[in-house]
Design a protein with these regions (language model features):
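Conserved GNAT acetyl-CoA-binding A-motif
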Residues: 104, 111-122
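Conserved GNAT-fold acetyl-CoA-binding loop/helix
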Residues: 22-41
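Conserved active-site alpha-helix within GNAT-family acetyltransferase domains
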Residues: 101, 125-143, 148
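A short helix-loop-beta-strand connector motif used in the catalytic cores of GNAT acetyltransferases and
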Residues: 43-55, 84
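A short beta-loop-alpha structural element at the N-terminal edge
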Residues: 2-16
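Conserved acetyl-CoA-binding loop-helix of GNAT-fold acetyltransferases
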Residues: 87-90, 96-109, 136
């Protein structure tokens, strides 16, 4: 497995994984060509030093997973840094092969390199398998999350 920063050329593979997700098929637009909004978002993420959009390639060079890390400076924890993990996706035909565990081992090491004191994520309640996975690798459901769609 190779972990690397995503490039613009990876966007079709990333968006396809997101669109094939339980909820993604309801809100994403995986089309050829991709809507320009995805490329605009990529440019914004890529230009922000506190964001890392990553992909994982298999030995054949195929993108089999992706995730995004946001490093957030806080005043709490004596000015600590949190790592927010978002958009975790493993290609459907690659689930159950240990990619998720390798991904989170890599994420935790990267967070330590950046001086992070806390790694956090959210998972939709409609994804019970993902929730079990996160609990199985040590994450704890410690807070109630709230969202307001605009």
């Amino acid at each position: 497995m190779t972990f690397r920063q995503a490039t613009k050329e990876d966007l079709p593979s990333i968006i396809e994984m997101i669109a094939n997700d339980t909820l993604g098929h309801l809100r994403e637009r995986f089309e050829d060509p991709l809507p320009k909004e995805y490329y605009n978002a990529f440019e914004s993420i890529d230009g922000d030093r506190n964001q890392e959009l990553m992909v994982i390639e298999n030995s054949e060079g195929e993108v089999v997973a992706s995730f995004q890390l946001s490093f957030l400076q806080y005043l709490t924890y004596v000015g600590g840094i949190r790592c927010l993990v978002e958009n975790v996706h493993v290609r459907e035909d690659q689930t159950g092969k240990g990619i998720g565990k390798q991904m989170f081992q890599w994420i935790i090491e990267r967070a330590k390199e950046k001086g992070v004191h806390l790694v956090q994520l959210t998972s939709n309640k409609l994804r019970p398998n993902a929730i079990r996975f996160y609990e199985g690798i040590g994450f704890k459901a410690t807070h109630e999350g709230f969202k307001l769609h605009l």
